[in-house]
Amino acid sequence: MLKDKYIDYLTFEKRYSTHTILAYRADLDEYSGFLQSQYNIIDLLQSDHTLIRSWLISLLELKNSTRSVNRKISTLKSFYRFCEKMGLLETNPMIKVVAPQISKQLPVFLTHNNIDTLFQSVDFGSGLKGSRDKLILTLFYATGIRREELVNIKTNDIDLTTGTIKVLGKRNKERIIPIGPKVIAEINNYLLIRSNSTIIVEDANLNNNTTLFVTTRGLPVNPKLVYSIVHKYLALISSSSKLSPHVLRHTFATHMLDDGADINAIKELLGHSSLAATQVYTHNTIEKLKTIYKQAHPRA
């Protein structure tokens, strides 16, 4: 089946993450369903730009966000490029498809006061869950890693001697991120509590190569649990409507930039392939400068 061959291509050649592959598969299944229900077309190769446009219009009419629609366009572009590569298409139907423009929104981030309150005033508790949750939040803010990257960290990815963490990013790109003494102390505290937690022995696979973050049953945490943990604690210190792990990634980058870090260094730490992706954080800094200017300049 063509879709299966495409998924294999993403998995073994492009080496996309499981999360990305599931999203691409879901997009293709959704488009296939649309073609069948609306036009009685089963073969994706029989599609053309007019059918694709009609699907995109229907998505927007169903109140899908522009960002969501653009991701689905990316899926179809990737799929039909694959079909071209396989010699299955004479003309790529995506050539005449234009993605809707996304209104640029500045990244949401927490203030220094928010962060101080989170780590100095919030009571995480002294047990396994509390130490784990605090370390999860600490790592997000201290390293700027993505949620998928965090859940996949193994204990042997951490080198406490050199103060570094090895992270496997998008498309399996590996990078090394430095960590400071405070983070190392939190890691040591969590590992000590985890090793002394008798409930951990429920999972016979737990050893030196295991996933760093586990549940109280000794199972690896999943992205959904990590999201709920972060949202729970950020809701205690911020009234923002956006309280996801990515907010802590934005906060890491913004605070680094505000405190004088080189933007190229931030790019490497975040695992961005392009500097353009990192430069969005400079807009927050510019807005901050504008505020200071208006407050301080006599003719502002």
Locations of the language-model features?
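Conserved catalytic core of the tyrosine transesterase superfamily
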Residues: M1-A300
